[in-house]
Structures are given as structure tokens and as C-alpha cells.
Amino acid sequence: WNEALHGVARAGKATVFPQAIAMAATFDDEALYKTFTMVSDEARAKYHQYQKDKEYDRYKGLTFWTPNINIFRDPRWGRGMETYGEDPYLTVRMAVVKGLQGDDPKYFKTHACAKHYAVHSGPEWNRHEFDVTVTPRDLWQTYLPAFEALVKEGNVQEVMCAYNRYQGKPCCSSDKLLIDILRNSWGYENIILSDCGAINDFWQRDERTPRHETHPDAESASADAVLNGTDLECGNSYKALIKALKEGKISENDLDVSLRRLLKGRFELGMFDPDERVPYAQIPYNVVESPEHV
């Protein structure tokens, strides 16, 4: 995984564009589409160069945890610059996902990821234990519209569940958020993944960093997360799924549901096909930091 909030992050050179909140200030969705088309061009070019060089490290793939579509209404939240501001409608209109994922009828250019689902707008210091309380009106009019639009209109391929709890349950095991709303109501059939360490927050005890501690152990936490729709985690708790399977907390059929989604995503990125079949594999490396992008 990597991020591309305003350019391909971390993995070597890339064109750096303005921060997300500055791009939102243009109110120009067409400009954002063009910007993230350039970003995804560079992402694809860098990916295929890494493949040729046999470099398979983190930050060198095709999954980008972008955009951050949380609503920014408190200036004390230090990550507000990652977002598109305080307005749900403007956040919906920013054409980041379509620019990142491309328009080929068979292959996705990259995977975009809508984060952090849901009701996650800071503060950072207590997000691993915080239980969010919002009115139904605020949930549906403020915090969910951007996610719904990216699922229904943007065809976003990944959704990241947030660290915090909602109505007493961690977001990454929330049947209300993940099953009832995201999958059943909105018809989302693609990948749900956790933020880094989010599943550990279910069960891990840490005196320095209070956590949710809603589950007794890693196997219970991991099984609950998968059964409620979280296909993939960033972390190490899912190693306990083997034990959870042996203890009857989850079945192979349950695991296969998530496995199919994950493999489908890789097939649709063209990762198992020869480069000559994938149009995005033909993007030359010289687009990276090119004068046209600057």
C-alpha cells in the first residue's frame, strides 16, 4: 500500500501537488480529475519499473489509501489538510477516485481507497478508544454522503474502516456500518480493509495507549472483523485466524468470501496478466516529474 493524497508518496521521486484542502479550495472537480490522472500515471510507471527491478517493498504497489474524505470542522485536528474541508457536497464532487482508477473497461489503473469510514474527524490522541456519538441526522447528512457517493458514483475499489468505535463497536467490526449500510444498503462488493493496527485495538492491552478492549483475544477480534466485512487488515492480528478457524470461531467459507474479493482486486489491476495486455503498463517512466506534470 501507499498514499497519494497530493502525489505518489514515499517511494522515491514523484511530482508533488498542493495539499488536498488547497485543491478543494479551487472548487474545480475537472482540475482534480486531471491532477489525479497525472498522479496515477506516475504511480503506474513507478510500479512497473519496480517490478522490472524486482523491488516488491511496501509503498511500491498499486493500492493507494487515498482520498481522505472525512469532514473537517475543527481546526484543532492536525490532519485536516488531508481532507477537502467542511462541506460534504464539495467533498463528494472532488473527482479524485476517477482520476486514480482510470477509465479502461477491463483494468483499473490503481485502487483508490475511501477513508476513514466512518465518523472519524479527530482528535488523534484518543482515536484508539473513542466511542463516537452522533445524531442520525448528522451521521447521514454530514459523515456518510461522501462515502455513499464514492461507492455508488465513483466505484471506489477499497474502503478503509476507521480506528474509532461507533455505537459501542469498533468501526472495523461494526455490522451497522459495514454490513447494513455499506454492503447491503449501498451495494458495495469490493474490498474493506482496516487502518494500521485497528484490529489490535479490539483486544490488545497497552497502559500507555488506551484501546477499545472489546474482545478477549486476537482470534476473537479477527474472526469478528472478517465476519462483519473487513477483508484485509494492516497489522498482525489476522495471523490468529488460523487458530480462530480451528476453534470454530470462523469457517473456511467465511474466509473464502474475503479471499475472493482480494484476488478479484488483483486480477482487475492486471497483476496476473502479461504487461502487453494491460494498457496502463505502457505508460513510460519519463512521466514521473515530467515538465507536463509540473
Residue spans of the language-model regions?
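Glycoside hydrolase catalytic-domain context in secreted enzymes
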Residues: 1-294
